[in-house]
Amino acid sequence: MDLGSGLYLPIHSTHLLEHGHAAIKRVIVVVHGSGRNGNDYFERTIAPAAAMDLLEETLIIAPTFQTSEDGPSKDEPFWTSGGWKRGHLSSSSGPSPRVSSYTAIDRILELVLDSERFPILEQVTITGHSAGGQVTHRFAGTSRIENETAIPFRYVVANPSTYLYVGSERDSQAGFAIPNSAACADYDDWHYGLQDLNNYATAVSRDSIKVQLVRRDVRILIGSADSLNASLDVTCGANMQGRHRFERGQTLIRFMDAFDPGHGHQEVIVPGIGHSSTQMYMSEEGRSALFGS
């Protein structure tokens, strides 16, 4: 994928983006987890599309955000293992200019929103599971691409470790309140909250992030059995969001209810499923979130 300025991002795609496709009605951009295995997530998103006989009208794109360990080519930007998840700029030891991982997603979306390439496009969905879910939720609050089109967008956030909070309050026995942060001074910093924003988020502004994340169509897709701590962020800022992924998803919805009852987040629980992107996306609830109305 050509990002411009001589930079390229590895992607998997069901159709050639540059040439377009006249039959495409739906675009799904799926972001991999911490393993940076975009190819696996590509296949895991194709499976439900095929099961619903929607593959011919669906363009699935799976980018790969590399680190130095992945052996990127000299014209491929790479990030730290945490940086790509948070929308940080690519490494200064990689090619120039440095680019935010979220800007790279913006470039993909700009291409697919070209009506000459995809003239009957009806829906754009950004999704990710685990670390990809973190990217999806933060991207939903910070990207301005949706504002530039009338085509509906949806963000399907599956089993992330943490979420972006648009207020400084966190859950407590007394309800949502600003915590005593003496022992956890950075609990509300980016990427948990809206303090100390990175370059990409700063360009948007806190007020705009709040409005965007509150108003957009965001599906919080959580497995009821995702209650183990494997690969879970257990820093103090993360623990203020809940004990495990399932609880953190439910708590985020309760926060949004308290913050703005007219918000666009919807809780979608997948019964009996744990931390499995394959099972989440193939479930009835997952397929409805990805392909339903």
Predicted regions and their residues:
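The feature captures the conserved acid-bearing segment of alpha/beta-hydrolase catalytic domains
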Residues: 150-258
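Cap/lid segment of the alpha/beta-hydrolase catalytic domain
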Residues: 65-99
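C-terminal catalytic histidine-bearing segment of alpha/beta-hydrolase fold enzymes
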Residues: 221, 233-234, 250-293
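Structural cue for short, hydrophobic secondary-structure segments
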Residues: 28-33, 62, 220
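A domain-start/cap signature at the N-terminus of enzymes
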Residues: 1-27, 35, 39-59, 84-93, ...
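Gly/Ala-rich beta-loop-alpha elbow adjacent to hydrolase catalytic centers
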Residues: 128-132
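Short glycine-enriched nucleophile-adjacent loop
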Residues: 45-46, 133-146, 284
